[in-house]
A protein has these predicted regions:
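Phosphate-backbone binding interfaces of nucleic-acid-interacting proteins
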Residues: 1-107
Length: 107
């Protein structure tokens, strides 16, 4: 278990997907460009078998904004999106209510 102070170190932010494309040589990856309000980031997400890239564009999602960048075979991933799911029911992106805008901190 982590304590409350450790949990508070995780910076969850609202991000708007402004571009998404399949990573051609990867079975599961989509390259997603997000707007975090004051900056844009690239995130590689293993959701290719669940979402079409075009269906992601314009959506607000929740991302981990202070995750250390991770060098991958196809580029550097600068965050992680949040999703819920299991093998039986599939995977679903965590999305905010209407009114939330890019850069807002999830509390």
């Amino acid at each position: 278990m982590i304590n409350f102070d450790e949990f508070m170190k995780v910076d969850l932010r609202i991000a708007k997907v402004i571009d998404a494309e399949n990573v051609e040589q990867a079975d599961k990856l989509i390259k997603i460009t997000v707007d975090l309000g004051k900056e844009q980031r690239i995130i590689f997400a293993g959701i290719k078998d669940i979402y079409e890239p075009d269906s992601l564009i314009g959506r607000n999602i929740v991302v981990v904004a202070n995750l250390e960048p991770r060098k991958m075979r196809f580029g550097v991933s600068e965050g992680m999106l949040l999703a819920a799911g299991d093998d039986e029911n599939g995977v679903f992106l965590v999305t905010p209510d209407t009114g939330a805008s890019p850069g807002m901190r999830v509390r």
